[in-house]
Amino acid sequence: MNVWVQRATAGDWREIERVCGQTGLAGSPVDEAERAAFTEHWIRPYRELRPDWTWIAVCDKAVIGYLTSVPDTLAFEAERRRAYDPGPDSRDFFSEAVRRKLWTEHPAHFMLNVLADYRGMGAGTKLLHALYAELRRAKVPSAHLVCGPNSHFFFERMAFRVEASVSPVPGVTLRAMTRPVD
């Protein structure tokens, strides 16, 4: 199967929301009754505030993954918190000192999700390559993400390092990970 990556267009956001709903609970599906609110919270700010920083992975003409991002988290967070109810954010589990370090030393951030049946086929790697090429062009020095259980293995293989970790509930570890743009 051939997987390719392209910048998202206005017509792709429904599919991005579908993939988010099927992968948003630490890589597993979000409960059907909660999907609309979940995708609204996690996707809408990127769709409305930074749509040009989103890519999709496509296989057999279907969206199988996406990466939403921003080059400047401090500016994005200020705008997002003015425009929307910020609600829960995984970064809020980390101390202010950790958040400030992430946002200033590693100013870009992103979310990446790939449907379970397509993991291991290179979609995540291709999405990251697209992001990092754009970050390089924009002269952004580094990026961060907060990942849940199990996904940190992929990001470690992609040369991300753990800056901090926290367990907000027993059995769940969130990791703040960073990687410079070389």
Regions inferred by a protein language model and the residue ranges of each:
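Conserved acetyl-CoA-binding loop-helix of GNAT-fold acetyltransferases
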Residues: 120-134, 157
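C-terminal "cap" of GNAT-fold acetyltransferases
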Residues: 146-152, 158, 164-182
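Conserved GNAT acetyl-CoA-binding A-motif
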Residues: 106-108, 135-148
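Glycine-rich phosphate/pyrophosphate-binding loop shared by adenosine-nucleotide-utilizing enzymes
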Residues: 3, 61-66
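A short beta-loop-alpha structural element at the N-terminal edge
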Residues: 4-18
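Active-site rim helix/loop that mediates acceptor-substrate recognition in acyltransferases
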Residues: 32-54, 59, 68
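Helix-loop element at the rim of GNAT/NAT acetyltransferase active sites that forms part
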Residues: 18-33, 45-46
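Conserved acyl-donor/pantetheine-binding loop and adjacent beta-alpha core of acyl/acetyltransferases
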Residues: 68-112
